[in-house]
Amino acid sequence: FTPDLMPNDILGNEILDDSSKNSNFFRFLKGPVFSQLLLADEINRASPRTQSALLQSMQEKKVTVAGKNYDLPSPFHVLATQNPIDQEGTYPLPEAQLDRFLMNIKISYPKLEAEKGILILSNKDLDKEPAKILDFEDLLKYQSIVKSLPVGESIFKYILDIINNSRPETTNIKSIKENVLWGPSPRAS
């Protein structure tokens, strides 16, 4: 993502189709968000308006352009990166928007031995195609099976205990109180 990226650059646009000799009409040209796995690099470099368009599509699983709704493919997942907030040209994501992501992993520099491995791999010819182990129809089927499984009361209690003990204002765990600013929202449950 870049500062000049507009919402329609990721969502899509209506374009004038003049391929017919008798009439012109607008047709929707889908943007990159219409994929099952969207890799969004440096999302906090985009303007808040563009960030909002991406995050709204993540929440609603659809896009609205020119008053028309377009469903996103299923499954739909977003992997995103952010630049550190203290870098110039970044727009911080509000907590309500960060909450749409399942996890936030801070990555530091690798150890020298690991970095050496990265350097060696980056100079190899890696033209071997990775093996396909799952297609999206199977993933949807497995998700449906998991959703249909009965969940016992003890599991709900266990999940809520984990969530409650991850919130600094409701836990007795000292390290959580000292190191966690914002606990998980109900969406995490």
Regions found by a protein language model. Give the residues of each.
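Conserved AAA+ ATPase "SRH/arginine-finger" region at the nucleotide-binding site
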Residues: 1-6, 102-114, 129-133, 148-151
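Acidic, glycine- and histidine-enriched catalytic cores of nucleic acid- and nucleotide-handling enzymes
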Residues: 117
